[in-house]
Amino acid sequence: MDVLRLLTWATLMTWVTLITLCSSAYAAGRAENRFGTIHVDGRKTGTVHYTIEYGEKGDVETLRTRASLSILGIKLFNFEQNLHEEWRGGGLRLMRSRTEDDGTHYSASLNRGPEKYKGVVNDKPIELPGHAFPASVWHYNVVRQSLLFDLMTLKPMNVRIARSDETMTVNNKTLAVERFDFTGDWKATVWFDQKRQLVKFEYPVPGHTVTIQLDD
């Protein structure tokens, strides 16, 4: 069960979300749908579908993502998360989340103050430095941070990031991508295309490698 819970946290906390935010500009009044697959140790075990909706000013308003994971047709666990974020000027101002992690429930809230974040996780107060950033791989700015925090528990995570250029084949197309390797308290590798859209996310857990590959 420990491995399954790590798989849940590693692969799905970022994906099974309902997010409201204001960030980068796109064409107004449209929605995008993207699909991908989840692999564990190279074997396909699940799927990902997320929809981005844009407001009248072209800002991202909502990001809805659903994912499932099973082996041999058996559902391994249940993970659901509703997450609300508000961003201004490229910075997170507040966040609210409710998560069910295979029967364990988390309720978290976070507000940005003048110098730090103040929040609550399951009725326990917490504080985070003002420069902490959510561990959300859909957001390109995650690669510019040294202090992240867990979206479910709000636990701070110190990271180091190394960047490199690569090419990747997706649906028989060769893409130029940026690769970012996270080490420290959070170990992951993330690939973005030239439009700074997420292409691939890989995360090691004890004895396994979990990969999420988005379709073109």
What are the functions of these language-model segments?
Residues 1-8:
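N-terminal secretory signal peptides that target proteins for export/translocation
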Residues 22-29:
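Boundary at the C-terminal end of the N-terminal hydrophobic targeting segment
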Residues 30-34, 38-113, 196, 203:
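N-terminal mature ectodomain segment of secretory-pathway/periplasmic proteins
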Residues 9-22:
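Bacterial N-terminal signal peptides
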Residues 29-32, 96-177, 181-183, 202, ...:
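Solvent-exposed helix/loop surface patches that form functional interfaces
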Residues 39, 169, 193:
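Short, acidic, Ser/Thr-enriched surface-loop or helix-capping motifs
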Residues 3, 69-77, 148-152:
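Short, aromatic- and cysteine-enriched interfacial helices/patches
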Residues 186-188, 192-202:
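Low-complexity, intrinsically disordered Gly/Pro/Thr-rich segments
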